[in-house]
A protein has these predicted regions:
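Charged docking surfaces used in two-component/phosphorelay signaling
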Residues: 21-29
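Non-catalytic signal-transmission and effector/linker regions of two-component phosphorelay proteins
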Residues: 1-11
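His-Asp phosphorelay/catalytic-motif detector in bacterial-type signaling
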Residues: 51-53, 78-83
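Active-site residues of response regulator receiver
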Residues: 58, 88
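Conserved acidic carboxylate
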Residues: 14
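Acidic, metal-coordinating helix/loop segments flanking the phosphotransfer/catalytic sites
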Residues: 36-54
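The feature encodes the CheY-like receiver
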Residues: 62, 80, 92
Length: 98
């Protein structure tokens, strides 16, 4: 199956192994190259090797939060335009507004 147009590599940062593995599996089944990372350190090293076409970020991570990672990506000229989708288990109204 050919990759989705424009998305050859998607990185997914998620500390829950089951969610991360299932999401990466689903992306690969659609012909998209995908890699999952459990923490920011692994993700940062991967971005240094290869800038992805898109990033999926969990908001709550053990070593930092997805918002801090997003700000760092936006501040770097190499990753400033990479599309980012934030994912979270937070479900209160206040969380949704933020």
């Amino acid at each position: 199956m050919p990759a989705a147009k424009g998305f050859n590599m998607i990185y997914y940062v998620e500390d829950d192994d089951n969610i991360r593995d299932l999401t990466v599996y689903a992306l690969r089944k659609q012909g998209i190259e995908a890699e999952g990372f459990s923490c920011d350190g692994e993700f940062k090293a991967a971005v240094a090797r290869r800038v992805p076409d898109a990033v999926l970020l969990d908001i709550m991570l053990p070593d930092t939060d997805g918002l801090a990672i997003m700000r760092r990506l936006r501040a770097d000229r190499l990753t400033a335009t990479v599309p980012i989708m934030m994912l979270t288990a937070k479900d209160t109204e206040l969380d949704k507004v933020m």
